[in-house]
Amino acid sequence: MNRNCIKFLLIFLFFSFSTKAQEKFSNPIIPGGYPDPSICKVGDTFYIVNSSFEYFPGLPIHKSKDLINWELIGYGLHRKSQVNSTVNLIDVQSNGGIHAPTIRHKDGIYYIITTNVYYDEEREKADMVNFIITAKNPAGPWSDPIHIQGAPGIDPDLFFDDDGRVWYVGNQMPENPNFEGEGEIWLQELDINEFKLIGGKHL
């Protein structure tokens, strides 16, 4: 009886250590500068996109099956024609550029929605352009940026509701802030075919 218990214990310890050895991974999982991650899962694959600020190509996209091993598969902004008009990365400042993207998938289409920040030094003001790009393959090619007119603030997100409607969710500065840097969350329905805000805004 004792011999069987010892055998069982040894087998248990062997598999425990083997499992722990397989669970080891490096931190950070994706080394380098990949802040503000947004992730979505399609089938058995995870896709992640990050801020890229003033760098081009921009919006790096990685994929993974296990959330540990990641492969860079492309960039949302990969053509110069994407960044010289609505989105300006030609002479953008080092504290501007692409901030806090969101990646989503619906009905075979991938969406990235994000903010381009451009500081106008003459006016001492930051211009913020919220825009969407789309692709049928997350590795690209991605569409030209589509400016979401009437969408103030930063950190945009997309919510696909069960009733078929799509909502734009954003963060903006309130009209009468209680403290410096205060933000408020707002949402508004988005026509996902025309990429236009419709209906009223909800705070």
Each model region followed by its residue ranges:
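Bacterial Sec-dependent N-terminal signal peptides
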Residues: 1-23
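Carbohydrate-active catalytic/glycan-binding domains of CAZyme proteins
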Residues: 21-203
